[in-house]
C-alpha cells in the first residue's frame, strides 16, 4: 500500500513538473488552448466558412473566398 501511494505521488509530481518545464522552455500551455490559439482557430473556421465544403481534390482559398483545385506537380 505504501509503495503504491509513493508511486502515484511520484507520477503526479513528474507529470506536473514536465508541464511546467515545457511551458518554461517554449511557452507551451498544457492546460488547454490559450487565447491566441482559440482566436486563430476561430479565424480559420470563419475563413473556411466562406468557401463552404470544397469538393474532393480542392482546397479553400480564404483570400479569394472560393474553392480552388489542388496543384500536383
Swiss-Prot record:
Propiece residues: 20-47
Post-translational modification: Contains 2 disulfide bonds.
Family affiliation: Belongs to the conotoxin L superfamily.
Organism: Californiconus californicus
Highest taxon of source: Eukaryota
Disulfide bond found in the keyword field: yes
Subcellular location: Secreted
Signal peptide, first to last residue: 1-19
This protein's GO CC annotations: extracellular region
Identification of the protein by name: Conotoxin Cl14.8
Tissue specificity comment: Expressed by the venom duct.
GO molecular function: toxin activity
Keywords: Disulfide bond, Neurotoxin, Secreted, Signal, Toxin
Domain notes: The cysteine framework is XIV (C-C-C-C).
Principal location class: secreted
